[in-house]
Amino acid sequence: MLDIKRIRNDFDQIAEKLARRGVDEKTLHDLKELDFKRRQLLIKSEEAKAERNTASAAIAQAKRNQEDASEQIADMQKLSAEIKALDAQLVEIDGQLKTFTTTLPNIPADDVPLGADEDENVEMRRWGKPRQFDFDIKAHWDLGEDLDILDWERGSKVTGSRFLFYKGLGARLERAIYNFMLDEHAKEGYTEVIPPYMVNHDSMFGTGQYPKFKEDTFELADNDYVLIPTAEVPLTNYYRGEIIDGKELPIYFTAMSPSFRSEAGSAGRDTRGLIRLHQFHKVEMVKFAKPEDSYNELEKMTANAENILQKLELPYRVITLCTGDMGFSAAKTYDLEVWIPAQNTYREISSCSNTEDFQARRAQIRYRDEVDGKVKLLHTLNGSGLAVGRTVAAILENYQNADGSVTIPEVLRPYIGGVQVISPQS
């Protein structure tokens, strides 16, 4: 959520930056006018309340003097009616202001590239070289079916499209991957957390999913619970409404959880395979940091995600998202894209973002500065470390062999009982 004071005091710069994200300047002018109207009404309300207090004192004095106070009483009743009307207008305007400020995206950082969509993202670097195959390669969904480790047909029967069963060494591979990821993040100082897989609406508001992206979620009927779209939601809301001792910052959390997404607007996209599912596992990283440290923490978080891909020896690239492709809450985002041979392209496997104080303001997560003792909004960061299903897809395709088998990356073998190869026979 944006700071209305910042918009008020630095209107032109904020309008220019939000225009890069597709926000019409008229929207901000309407917001500014509404804010001005609110402040004028507030002044009138406070003045009327002061007059009412004066009238009340005059009535009390008149009664003590046994004098007629009917005129003062009439004045006070008139003032009370005026105050009631002013306060009703303030409540209405506050609601309109909240709608404005909670639906505006975050302000992009100064170094975020200007662009309309993903075609204008900027590649930063690449790691590893895509493998050259001397045989006809298979897509991961065909490999999974041929090896009898992934079953989409029965997933569709039991639930519906975009669901599947992992089985046998497929299930063990998935488990090996996320255990490896969690162990690697723990080495970097992250505290492992097992969060709730359902959260309330306040939590969804805190991280920016609600109200704007409500259609992308799965809500439970007849209660306030929502299935989490990412562990970012419960992890970030862990400190919602709290004041943290500044000496404790930065704080690192990591968690593996299922993620549930309706994929509204994705009809026809990635209908086969593990790239786009309604339910998938993801290892998440979340950080709470002081404002002056947050961009250094973003670089470190991105490096933590890269570390996983490097140890798995999966080729990838890092891109900086442009203004038109960033998520709603982000001020700056790096995407990691892993090489998927059957598609002959890189696909997103991690997204690491600094939201600055955008989520912290919505969730009221603050810290007490140990130097000046003041309570301030902190910065929150989040990143995938990594999407587990997409990692399975990348391993199956990059490590496939001519005989239809798949070699297990060396770093995962201790997590899967020493198994080196998944073959049709195994």
UniProtKB/Swiss-Prot annotation:
Which residues of this UniProt protein bind L-serine?
Answer: 230-232, 284, 384
What top-level branch of life does the organism fall under?
Bacteria
Task: Give the EC number.
Answer: 6.1.1.11
- Primary localization: cytoplasm
Q: Which SUPFAM superfamilies match?
A: Class II aaRS and biotin synthetases, tRNA-binding arm
Q: Pathway, per UniProt?
A: Aminoacyl-tRNA biosynthesis; selenocysteinyl-tRNA(Sec) biosynthesis; L-seryl-tRNA(Sec) from L-serine and tRNA(Sec): step 1/1
GO MF terms here are: ATP binding; catalytic activity, acting on a protein; serine-tRNA ligase activity; transferase activity
Keywords associated with the record: Aminoacyl-tRNA synthetase, ATP-binding, Cytoplasm, Ligase, Nucleotide-binding, Protein biosynthesis
Which InterPro entries does this UniProt record tie to the protein? aa-tRNA-synt_IIb (IPR002314), aa-tRNA-synth_II (IPR006195), aa-tRNA-synth_II/BPL/LPL (IPR045864), Ser-tRNA-ligase_type_1 (IPR002317), Ser-tRNA-synth_1_N (IPR015866), SerRS_1_N_sf (IPR042103), SerRS_core (IPR033729), tRNA-bd_arm (IPR010978)
Name one matching Pfam family. Answer: Seryl_tRNA_N
Q: Name one GO biological process term.
A: selenocysteine biosynthetic process
Do the record's keywords include ATP-binding? yes
The record's subcellular locations are:
Cytoplasm
**Gene Ontology CC annotations of this record:** cytoplasm
UniProt family annotation: Belongs to the class-II aminoacyl-tRNA synthetase family. Type-1 seryl-tRNA synthetase subfamily.
User: Record's domain comment?
Assistant: Consists of two distinct domains, a catalytic core and a N-terminal extension that is involved in tRNA binding.
Its recorded name reads Serine--tRNA ligase
Tell me what organism the protein belongs to.
Streptococcus mutans serotype c (strain ATCC 700610 / UA159)
